[in-house]
Amino acid sequence: MAASGSLLDGAAQKKLVAPPGYTIENMGGLEHLKPDKPEQIAMLIYPGMTALDLIGPQQAFGYMMGAKVHLIWKDLLPVESDTGVKITPTAAMKDLPEPVDLIFVPGGGKGTVALMSDAEVLDFLAREGKTARYVTSVCSGSLVLGAAGLLRGYRATSHWAVREVLPTLEAIPASGRVVEDRNRITAGGVTAGIDFGLYLVAKLRGDYYAQALQLMLEYDPHPPFHSGTPDDARADIRDLATVMYAPLLKSAGLAAEARKMNWSKHS
């Protein structure tokens, strides 16, 4: 299903009450909402990723008391994002604790396309995806999940500029800030990662926890312009962005075609 806004309808929101024992002085009101076995969350990082794709969800997951959030890559050397931000992994892929509850892939540009043909990473994701409770992505990270064969027959979204590549990877393209199909949860471009993070916190810890977190983050977006989607943007701005993204669309499409041919050879 596509999701936007609150996970609760109006009637359910009226019934939302603080958990037993909660007071302003007793922040243990959220503490006792922790599961008996804290979640293991694996967030892939890689050279050329978009930092905000990662940071929005990581901020939300990091506020889940007791959860273990692992930033994973092939080794423990810092990786540089597409804007030059360096992020240090906390675990190598080979050392990831098993099993994980959630596997996550952020998007990017050239770095994402490179990952779509990286056998080591794709094999790792395919293996973890078999047992993870949730298989997830933000932005063009869904193309990496698709290249790993994890979106075959699933509805999924991506950044609007590359969403049309998904069918090549046998996924069913869908629009929406967050799209859920069984245990696959994908989000749209970049800033959708914050919505995605809150959505996953609600699924893992409940709506009360997620709404408290939303307030703590003061997440109440009021963008200065209404050009955040192709439908809302002025035609000339949309055309400009489309031209700017054309090389990425082409390279991602070629990478997806190559991956599909690889599947055919081994089927």
Set out the residue ranges of the language-model regions:
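A conserved active-site-flanking secondary-structure segment within enzyme catalytic domains
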Residues: 151-178
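Active-site-proximal catalytic alpha-helix in oxidoreductases
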Residues: 142, 185-202
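Short pre-catalytic strand/loop immediately N-terminal to key active-site residues, enriched for Gly-Thr
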Residues: 129-131, 180-185
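Residues at secondary-structure transition points
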Residues: 115-119, 157, 188
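Structural detector of well-ordered beta-strand residues that form the stable sheet scaffold
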Residues: 135-136, 157, 174, 185
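Extended, subdomain-level signal for the structured scaffold at the beginning of enzyme domains
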Residues: 1-135, 143-146, 163-165, 173, ...
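Flexible glycine/proline-enriched surface loops and loop-helix/loop-strand junctions
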Residues: 108, 179-183, 194
